[in-house]
Amino acid sequence: MTLADLRTQADELDRNDSLAHLRDRFCIPRHTDGADVAYLCGNSLGLAPTAARECVEQELVAWEQLGVEGHFKHERPWVSFHELFAKHLAEIVGAKPYEVVAMNTLTVNLHLMLTSFYRPTHERFKVLVGHAAFPSDRYALASQIELRGHNPEEAILTAKPLAASRVLRTEDVVALIEQHASELALVLMDGVNYYTGERIDIAAITEAAHRHGIVAGFDLAHAAGNVPLALHDWNADFAVWCHYKYLNGGPGCVAGCFVHERHGFAREPRARMAGWWGHDKHSRFKMGPDFEPIPGAEGWQLSNPPLFSLAALLPSLELFAEAGMDRLRAKSEALTGFLELAIRGLFPEWGEVITPAEPARRGCQLSIRVTRDAKRAFVALVANGVICDWREPDVIRLAPVPLYNRFADIVRCVEVLSCAK
Ligand SMILES: Cc1ncc(COP(=O)(O)O)c(C=O)c1O
């Protein structure tokens, strides 16, 4: 394969891409040469939809013109604004609308879920986590374990890849669940791992955990909006995710949370951290002293939500609804496959792609452990308008996302690499 072949293929793929028009609905940053950057970093911070500014401005104007009356008299009243998101989020994570809610931020939601779902006993207090769990999740978990009087070093079991492999196979996680079933209270895994890009089988892990009465919860920061999900049917107990990566809600955007209906609608509501926005909507403003949770995920809300952050998120969710997850996933597999083909074909000695090769076991990110001049290659990419990221000690992450990336972006990435070598 040559670079010229790759360019020809990319031109054709871009010409035949039925989602190509969606790129115009995003603001693509410009490189110093005036051309669009090749933005391969949607796994870190998604780009701004062109409609986001207007959507936020509408709320600013409402605030200016209505003041407090915006809560009830605005055409999209703020008191119920977050409800606009349930249908979209339910589609994206495969849930019923009442099983999802947009609230807080990811780590806060993880704490809220651990408070309700990590119920250690003397015998069963351990938590199984994946090998490259995001540090914030480990900090949250360790602090929750300590708060319940256990020792995190003893209580956290880490599922590691078997010697020859860099990725964690679902069957190995299931084997660990079987092995430690009598001491596990919770399994907490990433849907897609932030470092390796590996995707785990949520249904299989949940099923194995439930066979032994263990709760199964998931961090979907890198899965939501990236891979198809069916949390309700897979029976997950809870999940949390952020909206600033694949869901393009902007930096620090309000996050998402899923609670399966069997918990959200249980006759005996789960213990939780409570706040007035989770209180029954009909009596919330009676300001009574006793907390009565809204059935479903909304019952875990604490505060009235950050309106401008929600407003910035809405246009992206509408784009997801317009494109449909099936079409996005098909393009995502094609883009990632093309990137892998280009890297393996043109730079076989550059490094090792540590993300699994099977499309079903990954999303749109490829993590490459670069064996030669890793930092130099990364610096060259960014200096030449290929925006990607670096994870210590030697991993470059490239993520072509189907909403706004073109096959031509991958060619640009490869062109820079071929000059940097
Ligand atoms: C997998 C994963 N979990 C948790 C977090 C923490 O998110 P937040 O800072 O929004 O709480 C991140 C942030 O990038 C992440 O990638």
Go through each PLM region and give its residues.
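Pyridoxal 5′-phosphate
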Residues: 1-421
